[in-house]
Amino acid sequence: MAGDWSSDVCSSDLEDIMEDNFTLCQGVSVGGAEKLRSCCHIQGDNIRGVLSCDIMAKVACGVIEKLAEPIFFFLELPDSERDGYKTYYLDNCTKEVALAIMKRYGTVLVNDGVSRFGFGSHKNDEEIYFTDYQEFQIYSRNPKKLEKLFDRLGIDVVGEDEVVTLWDLINEDNTGCISCVEADGETVFDIPENLKSEGMYEAE
Protein backbone atom coordinates (compact mmCIF):
# COMPACT_ATOMS: atom_id res chain seq x y z
CA MET A 1 0.00 0.00 0.00
CA ALA A 2 2.37 2.62 -1.24
CA GLY A 3 1.81 6.28 -0.52
CA ASP A 4 2.09 8.94 2.13
CA TRP A 5 -0.41 10.31 4.61
CA SER A 6 -0.39 13.59 6.47
CA SER A 7 -1.63 12.40 9.85
CA ASP A 8 -2.72 9.34 11.79
CA VAL A 9 -6.51 9.32 11.48
CA CYS A 10 -6.69 6.73 14.25
CA SER A 11 -5.06 9.03 16.81
CA SER A 12 -7.10 9.00 20.00
CA ASP A 13 -5.85 12.14 21.72
CA LEU A 14 -8.80 13.49 23.66
CA GLU A 15 -7.96 17.05 22.62
CA ASP A 16 -8.60 16.00 19.02
CA ILE A 17 -11.85 14.23 19.86
CA MET A 18 -14.02 16.09 22.29
CA GLU A 19 -15.48 18.78 20.04
CA ASP A 20 -18.85 20.38 20.70
CA ASN A 21 -19.83 21.02 17.08
CA PHE A 22 -21.10 18.40 14.66
CA THR A 23 -18.90 18.62 11.56
CA LEU A 24 -19.77 17.63 8.01
CA CYS A 25 -17.45 15.61 5.79
CA GLN A 26 -16.05 17.42 2.75
CA GLY A 27 -18.29 15.47 0.39
CA VAL A 28 -21.49 16.08 2.36
CA SER A 29 -23.59 19.24 2.34
CA VAL A 30 -26.78 19.70 4.39
CA GLY A 31 -28.06 22.85 6.05
CA GLY A 32 -28.61 22.81 9.81
CA ALA A 33 -26.09 20.07 10.59
CA GLU A 34 -24.80 22.07 13.55
CA LYS A 35 -27.98 21.04 15.38
CA LEU A 36 -26.99 17.38 15.38
CA ARG A 37 -24.88 15.34 17.78
CA SER A 38 -22.95 12.12 17.38
CA CYS A 39 -25.18 9.43 18.81
CA CYS A 40 -26.33 5.86 18.38
CA HIS A 41 -29.04 3.44 19.40
CA ILE A 42 -28.29 -0.12 20.53
CA GLN A 43 -30.89 -2.80 19.94
CA GLY A 44 -29.79 -6.34 20.57
CA ASP A 45 -26.71 -7.06 18.47
CA ASN A 46 -27.25 -4.05 16.22
CA ILE A 47 -26.05 -0.47 16.60
CA ARG A 48 -26.98 2.37 14.29
CA GLY A 49 -26.32 6.09 14.48
CA VAL A 50 -24.76 9.20 13.01
CA LEU A 51 -21.25 10.57 13.49
CA SER A 52 -19.52 13.90 13.27
CA CYS A 53 -16.83 13.71 10.59
CA ASP A 54 -13.99 14.34 13.02
CA ILE A 55 -14.56 11.06 14.89
CA MET A 56 -15.57 8.68 12.08
CA ALA A 57 -12.06 7.35 11.47
CA LYS A 58 -11.48 6.94 15.20
CA VAL A 59 -14.66 4.88 15.48
CA ALA A 60 -13.52 2.71 12.57
CA CYS A 61 -10.12 2.12 14.15
CA GLY A 62 -11.62 1.47 17.58
CA VAL A 63 -13.96 -1.18 16.18
CA ILE A 64 -11.17 -2.75 14.10
CA GLU A 65 -9.18 -3.22 17.31
CA LYS A 66 -12.03 -5.34 18.69
CA LEU A 67 -12.73 -7.43 15.58
CA ALA A 68 -11.61 -11.06 15.55
CA GLU A 69 -9.08 -11.91 12.85
CA PRO A 70 -9.10 -12.52 9.96
CA ILE A 71 -10.70 -9.21 8.97
CA PHE A 72 -12.10 -8.07 5.63
CA PHE A 73 -12.30 -4.56 4.19
CA PHE A 74 -15.08 -3.66 1.78
CA LEU A 75 -15.77 -0.63 -0.38
CA GLU A 76 -18.95 0.23 -2.28
CA LEU A 77 -18.58 2.61 -5.23
CA PRO A 78 -21.42 4.10 -7.30
CA ASP A 79 -22.03 2.35 -10.61
CA SER A 80 -23.95 4.60 -12.97
CA GLU A 81 -24.41 1.83 -15.52
CA ARG A 82 -26.33 -0.36 -13.09
CA ASP A 83 -27.81 2.45 -10.99
CA GLY A 84 -26.33 0.85 -7.90
CA TYR A 85 -22.96 0.05 -6.38
CA LYS A 86 -19.94 -2.04 -7.22
CA THR A 87 -18.59 -3.79 -4.13
CA TYR A 88 -14.91 -4.56 -3.64
CA TYR A 89 -13.39 -6.80 -0.96
CA LEU A 90 -9.97 -7.33 0.55
CA ASP A 91 -10.10 -10.54 2.59
CA ASN A 92 -7.98 -12.15 5.30
CA CYS A 93 -6.48 -8.99 6.77
CA THR A 94 -4.79 -8.79 10.14
CA LYS A 95 -5.72 -5.94 12.47
CA GLU A 96 -2.41 -4.33 11.52
CA VAL A 97 -3.33 -4.37 7.83
CA ALA A 98 -6.87 -3.10 8.47
CA LEU A 99 -5.52 -0.22 10.54
CA ALA A 100 -2.92 0.47 7.83
CA ILE A 101 -5.76 0.81 5.31
CA MET A 102 -7.38 3.42 7.54
CA LYS A 103 -4.06 5.19 8.04
CA ARG A 104 -3.40 5.24 4.30
CA TYR A 105 -6.91 5.90 2.97
CA GLY A 106 -8.92 7.00 6.00
CA THR A 107 -9.01 10.69 5.07
CA VAL A 108 -10.52 10.11 1.63
CA LEU A 109 -12.79 7.28 2.80
CA VAL A 110 -14.30 9.36 5.58
CA ASN A 111 -14.64 12.60 3.65
CA ASP A 112 -16.03 11.13 0.45
CA GLY A 113 -19.77 11.52 0.12
CA VAL A 114 -20.67 9.01 -2.59
CA SER A 115 -18.98 5.81 -1.39
CA ARG A 116 -19.65 3.43 1.47
CA PHE A 117 -17.12 1.29 3.31
CA GLY A 118 -16.52 -0.90 6.31
CA PHE A 119 -14.65 -3.71 8.02
CA GLY A 120 -15.81 -7.07 9.31
CA SER A 121 -14.65 -10.32 10.86
CA HIS A 122 -14.54 -13.52 8.84
CA LYS A 123 -14.64 -15.41 12.13
CA ASN A 124 -17.92 -14.22 13.64
CA ASP A 125 -19.51 -11.81 11.12
CA GLU A 126 -19.15 -8.75 13.39
CA GLU A 127 -18.98 -5.66 11.21
CA ILE A 128 -18.95 -1.88 10.99
CA TYR A 129 -20.48 -0.20 7.94
CA PHE A 130 -20.33 3.51 7.08
CA THR A 131 -23.18 4.58 4.81
CA ASP A 132 -24.63 7.75 3.24
CA TYR A 133 -24.74 11.07 5.07
CA GLN A 134 -22.39 10.00 7.88
CA GLU A 135 -24.56 7.23 9.24
CA PHE A 136 -23.06 4.00 10.54
CA GLN A 137 -24.17 0.52 11.48
CA ILE A 138 -22.44 -2.05 13.66
CA TYR A 139 -23.24 -5.70 14.19
CA SER A 140 -21.65 -6.93 17.41
CA ARG A 141 -22.32 -10.02 19.48
CA ASN A 142 -21.35 -8.00 22.54
CA PRO A 143 -22.24 -4.32 22.07
CA LYS A 144 -21.22 -3.54 25.65
CA LYS A 145 -17.57 -3.91 24.66
CA LEU A 146 -17.98 -0.75 22.56
CA GLU A 147 -19.51 1.43 25.28
CA LYS A 148 -16.11 2.67 26.51
CA LEU A 149 -15.17 3.65 22.95
CA PHE A 150 -18.43 5.55 22.50
CA ASP A 151 -18.03 7.30 25.84
CA ARG A 152 -14.43 8.31 25.10
CA LEU A 153 -15.40 9.74 21.73
CA GLY A 154 -18.43 11.59 23.05
CA ILE A 155 -21.01 9.44 21.24
CA ASP A 156 -24.28 9.45 23.15
CA VAL A 157 -26.17 6.16 23.43
CA VAL A 158 -29.84 7.16 23.10
CA GLY A 159 -33.29 5.79 22.46
CA GLU A 160 -34.29 4.89 18.92
CA ASP A 161 -36.50 7.97 18.51
CA GLU A 162 -33.68 10.23 19.72
CA VAL A 163 -31.33 9.43 16.85
CA VAL A 164 -31.57 12.48 14.58
CA THR A 165 -29.67 12.10 11.31
CA LEU A 166 -28.81 14.31 8.37
CA TRP A 167 -31.59 12.58 6.46
CA ASP A 168 -34.05 14.04 8.98
CA LEU A 169 -32.93 17.55 8.00
CA ILE A 170 -33.41 17.04 4.26
CA ASN A 171 -36.59 18.39 2.67
CA GLU A 172 -37.72 20.41 -0.36
CA ASP A 173 -36.25 23.58 1.09
CA ASN A 174 -33.09 21.97 2.46
CA THR A 175 -31.81 19.55 -0.15
CA GLY A 176 -28.76 17.52 0.75
CA CYS A 177 -25.84 16.97 -1.58
CA ILE A 178 -23.10 14.33 -1.64
CA SER A 179 -20.02 14.44 -3.84
CA CYS A 180 -16.74 12.68 -4.54
CA VAL A 181 -13.66 14.26 -2.95
CA GLU A 182 -9.94 14.09 -3.58
CA ALA A 183 -7.19 13.74 -0.98
CA ASP A 184 -3.51 13.87 -1.90
CA GLY A 185 -4.40 13.46 -5.57
CA GLU A 186 -6.51 10.34 -5.02
CA THR A 187 -10.21 9.51 -4.83
CA VAL A 188 -12.00 6.44 -3.50
CA PHE A 189 -12.18 5.18 -7.08
CA ASP A 190 -8.39 4.69 -7.02
CA ILE A 191 -8.47 2.36 -4.02
CA PRO A 192 -9.49 -0.92 -5.73
CA GLU A 193 -6.71 -0.60 -8.30
CA ASN A 194 -4.18 0.47 -5.67
CA LEU A 195 -5.01 -2.56 -3.52
CA LYS A 196 -5.38 -5.02 -6.39
CA SER A 197 -1.86 -6.31 -5.83
CA GLU A 198 -2.80 -6.97 -2.20
CA GLY A 199 -5.76 -9.10 -3.31
CA MET A 200 -8.67 -6.66 -3.56
CA TYR A 201 -11.35 -7.85 -5.95
CA GLU A 202 -14.79 -6.91 -7.23
CA ALA A 203 -17.68 -9.02 -5.96
CA GLU A 204 -19.71 -10.75 -8.65
Describe the residue ranges of each PLM region.
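Surface-exposed, low-hydrophobicity interaction/linker segments
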Residues: 44-126
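Short, compositionally biased low-complexity segments
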Residues: 29-38, 72-81, 165-167
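Short, flexible, solvent-exposed loop/turn segments with mixed acidic/basic and small polar residues
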Residues: 35-40, 119-132
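Acidic, proline/glycine-rich low-complexity IDRs
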Residues: 7, 129-204
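Single conserved hydrophobic/aromatic residue that forms the stacking wall/gate
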Residues: 1-10
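N-terminal domain-start signal
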Residues: 13-50
